[in-house]
Amino acid sequence: MKKAVILLNMGGPSSLLEVDMFLKNMFNDPRILPIKSPFFRSLVASFIANRRSETAKANYRKIGGKSPLIGHTFNLIQKLQSLDPSRFYTYAMRYTPPMTDMAVRELAQKEIEEVTLFSLYPQYSTTTTLSSIEEFHKQCALLSYFPKTKEIDRYFEDSNYNEAIIDRILEALGGDNPEEFTLIFSAHGLPQSVIDAGDPYEKEVHANIQALTKLLEERGITFKKITHAYQSKVGPMKWLEPSLDEVLKLHAKEKILLYPIAFTLDNSETDFELRIEYQEKATHLGITDYRVASCLNDSTRFAHAIIKLISQGEIS
């Protein structure tokens, strides 16, 4: 039986020419902008995208004119394929090429009979994980392609995954004393209304932090303090709290090590928002040592964790 694994993520522009596409596709997603009428949602999405276009392009210019996410994803695929040639590995992005329809068409052409959907979001959310999974099944139906499927839609409590995160945290410390640092686990924010409607994201972020805190204790790694924050708030609605701005103000003049807990791959919100925008805010607050740990990207330990999760969830 021919088996494949498809990594699911939101995507990001590969050039400045794709920024408008990325914004319009994202805000036209009913899981992001819950307007029932496709026509009116499309109008609102275009309006929001047009308002944000120039600012977004300016931000991307500061990190090389593109999102690093596509490159990291490709490198991870190469690593997985070399470690596990028994399966075909590919990926699908929700809002930019290579999009889900392209990936599904490739799987159908290869006559893949069994597909594991692997979310690159470690915690489950309707706005991210579910959106990507729904799109996969929609595109399969359009092609009348119905392979056996298995979904790995969260793995925030997996010990192998969390050990890979500890490795990244230690790399960022670089041998310095962790007791001198406040460790902040920063997660992408969501509107409070999404959580109130039953989305499990906030609970799973907290559970992930608890699992990592326990692992740090078991390994004898002690920080001055461990806390959490939410980043990337947009608009006037109430979002998850505390915000990263608030948490940094509380720890002004301290040494800060930040880990982006909601991301497995570095992207514009780590490379620009955390490493550039918040670096400037940290400096303004008197934080003289501000560090952002790298995401897992194509680390060998992360790749092995993915393969093990897939093997454990193998379709019988």
From Swiss-Prot:
EC no.? 4.98.1.1
**EC top class named in words:** lyase
What GO terms fall under cellular component here? Answer: cytoplasm
The organism's place on the tree of life at top rank:
Bacteria
Q: Which SUPFAM superfamilies match?
A: Chelatase
Q: Name one GO molecular function term.
A: metal ion binding
InterPro entries, alphabetically? Ferrochelatase, Ferrochelatase_AS, Ferrochelatase_C, Ferrochelatase_N
Q: Which reaction does it catalyse?
A: heme b + 2 H(+) = protoporphyrin IX + Fe(2+)
* Chief localization: cytoplasm
Involved pathway(s): Porphyrin-containing compound metabolism; protoheme biosynthesis; protoheme from protoporphyrin-IX: step 1/1
UniProt-listed PROSITE patterns: FERROCHELATASE (PS00534)
The protein's location, in the record's own words, is:
Cytoplasm
Binding, Fe cation = H188, E269
Task: List UniProt keywords, sorted A-Z.
Answer: Cytoplasm, Heme biosynthesis, Iron, Lyase, Metal-binding, Porphyrin biosynthesis
A Pfam family matched by this chain, by name? Ferrochelatase
One of the GO biological process terms: heme biosynthetic process
Family note: Belongs to the ferrochelatase family.
| Function description | Catalyzes the ferrous insertion into protoporphyrin IX.
Q: What is this protein called?
A: Ferrochelatase
